């Protein structure tokens, strides 16, 4: 455990950031899975789920959780599944 006050604060801040990042990544994956599940089931609200998944990917990229190439790849694959 850190002894210096600033190091203690960094540990606390890093834990909060890690929890926030994990939550955001989970939300992105969940949005993509919801879209895929709805696509297989032939749901009516496919447009809304597609937009939500794209938005989640963009948000994760803007926060630096995923790199630009992964965001583009995920969006491209999602769009291909949406078009089928």
Curated annotation (Swiss-Prot):
Disulfide bonds: none annotated. This is Small ribosomal subunit protein bS20. InterPro entries: Ribosomal_bS20, Ribosomal_bS20_sf. Binds directly to 16S ribosomal RNA. PANTHER family: 30S RIBOSOMAL PROTEIN S20, SMALL RIBOSOMAL SUBUNIT PROTEIN BS20C. One of its GO terms (molecular function) is small ribosomal subunit rRNA binding. Pfam families: Ribosomal_S20p (PF01649). GO terms for biological process: translation. The gene is rpsT. The keyword rRNA-binding applies. Keywords: Ribonucleoprotein, Ribosomal protein, RNA-binding, rRNA-binding. It comes from the Bacteria. It comes from Limosilactobacillus fermentum (strain NBRC 3956 / LMG 18251) (Lactobacillus fermentum). Coiled coil: none annotated. One of its GO terms (cellular component) is cytosol.
């Amino acid at each position: 455990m850190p002894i210096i006050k600033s190091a203690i604060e960094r540990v606390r801040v890093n834990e909060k950031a890690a929890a926030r990042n994990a939550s955001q990544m989970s939300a992105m994956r969940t949005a993509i899975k919801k879209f895929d599940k709805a696509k297989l089931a032939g749901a009516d609200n496919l447009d809304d789920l597609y937009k939500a998944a794209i938005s989640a990917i963009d948000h994760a990229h803007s926060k630096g959780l995923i790199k630009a190439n992964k965001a583009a790849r995920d969006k491209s694959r999602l769009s291909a599944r949406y078009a089928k």
